[in-house]
């Protein structure tokens, strides 16, 4: 046996131990405590982001705001009534894997579709609101998204109420595009 081989195992063990020591010396940060700004990369306390209306205090960059959080920020507390909750799109052109993808997003986001519509009060005044949520297929517009927004605007018109739409979208859903284009009223 060579003298080199005699100490090989010791070198490997010492490398593993030194790597573990470096990991152990890093401070543990509880999950969800910090948010990273996508614009400047700064780590900001999550509560500060929320209190600052989702604007980075370092660079002024914007954080994404989920639909129900946006409604909570705008509508008077306890006054929001959601409309058409059960209106969801389908898979009219039998796009492979689309139903599974939608179901996974529904479970992950707690949303049934990419837009939340309803009525609430802003400073005591009734208002109709539609809020898109980019977490759900980039808030792309499928049949149900268009229908929910249309119904909200029509109802607001009937009730003579103002409408606020927070729109953000990745475009039209290719999985439903043929169906939308072939609709008789399109």
Predicted regions and their residues:
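Conserved P-loop NTPase/AAA+ ATPase motor core
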Residues: 98-117, 136-138, 160-161
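Conserved small/polar residues in nucleotide/adenosyl-binding loops
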Residues: 178-182
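Glycine-rich anion/phosphate-binding loops
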Residues: 108-114, 139-154
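A structural preference for short, pocket-lining loop segments at secondary-structure junctions
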Residues: 120-132, 148-173
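Intrinsically disordered, low-complexity segments enriched in small/flexible residues
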Residues: 1-111, 122
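Short acidic, glycine/serine/threonine-rich loops at helix termini
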Residues: 141, 175-177
